[in-house]
Amino acid sequence: MTQPTCPCGSGDPLDDCCGRYHQGHPAPTAEALMRSRYSAYALGLVDYLRDTTLPAQQAGLDLDGIRAWSHGSTWLGLEVENHEVLGGQPEHARVTFVARWHDAEGEHAHRECSGFVQRNGRWYFLDPTVALKLGRNDPCPCGAGGKLKKCCGPWIT
């Protein structure tokens, strides 16, 4: 039996690509995490999308809205334009991409430069749509111990 191709656009079988991350293996790079999140949208894996968002932001996610968008869309493709590791402790990265989908309103393309942070061997998406009630001098919610303004602040405030 032929395995389905991964929705992320790699051309690889799902189980050899993003499927292993969906099953719990940590994504080795921010780009791999971003690709696996696109695949999760295409496959309706809302729990994975929640679990790969910065833990301090997870409670603020609209999971019903994510589920409705995921299931109500036909996912047409992903193009990664750039992946940049920024370094630091904790390590940060940026991934610029274009995601395409079709829904009841037509065909769409969304270009985004997303921020990611690595903590304890796992990459997390920094969701700019989930507000955190923190001041710039408060400890960063990623748990690194530094101030928000010097750590993840540029991505989530």
From Swiss-Prot:
Q: Which Pfam families would you find in this protein's record?
A: SEC-C (PF02810), YchJ_M-like (PF17775)
Looking up InterPro entries in the UniProt record yields: NTF2-like_dom_sf, SEC_C_motif, UPF0225, YchJ-like_M
Instruction: Specify the superkingdom.
Output: Bacteria
Q: Which family does it belong to?
A: Belongs to the UPF0225 family.
HAMAP family (alphabetical): UPF0225
Specify the protein name: UPF0225 protein PA14_50900
Source species of the chain: Pseudomonas aeruginosa (strain UCBPP-PA14)
